[in-house]
């Protein structure tokens, strides 16, 4: 089991507007977030994800399918996490709902962030 923050069955409150947690599934870290990924929450989002990533070497899946809103600060945090994964030679995938995917595609980051449509597809890609 990964060290660092404990995996939890319920999402913990990272800020007033963002909850997050992770689980280990199919030899991958699966992060789940709900709420808003914006200027107010990006610092806590980044710190939480970075702490978990630094504690182990498993591939990472960021499930943002329940995120209501992403602004430029949130996109910046996602880019930094993607760079952290790339620098560590860690495979990663990102899943988003229509709103999140549209925002990512608007700034042409879908390939850089390894955006896919759903969690099963992401897990398949990471285990290949």
Summary of predicted features, one role per range:
Residues 114-121:
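Short acidic-hydrophobic, aromatic-tinged amphipathic segments that line or gate anion-handling sites
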Residues 1-5:
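Short, low-complexity N-terminal regulatory "tails/caps" that precede and couple sensory modules
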Residues 7-10, 71, 102, 122:
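Terminal low-complexity, poorly structured segments
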Residues 36-113:
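Amphipathic alpha-helical interaction surfaces in cytosolic regulatory modules
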Residues 6-50:
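STAS-typified acidic loop motif
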Residues 21, 29, 68-70, 116:
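N-terminal hydrophobic or amphipathic segments with adjacent small-residue motifs
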Residues 122, 126-128:
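A short, charged, amphipathic alpha-helix used as a generic interaction element across diverse proteins
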């Amino acid at each position: 089991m990964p060290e660092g923050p404990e995996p939890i069955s319920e999402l913990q409150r990272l800020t007033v507007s963002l909850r997050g947690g992770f689980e280990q599934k199919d030899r991958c870290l699966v992060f789940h977030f709900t709420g808003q990924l914006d200027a107010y929450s990006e610092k806590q989002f980044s710190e939480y994800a970075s702490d978990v990533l630094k504690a182990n070497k498993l591939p990472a899946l960021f499930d943002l399918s329940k995120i209501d809103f992403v602004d430029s600060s949130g996109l910046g945090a996602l880019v930094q996490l993607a760079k952290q994964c790339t620098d560590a030679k860690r495979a990663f995938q990102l899943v988003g709902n229509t709103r999140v995917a549209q925002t990512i595609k608007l700034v042409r980051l879908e390939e850089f962030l390894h955006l896919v449509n759903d969690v099963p597809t992401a897990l398949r890609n990471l285990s290949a």
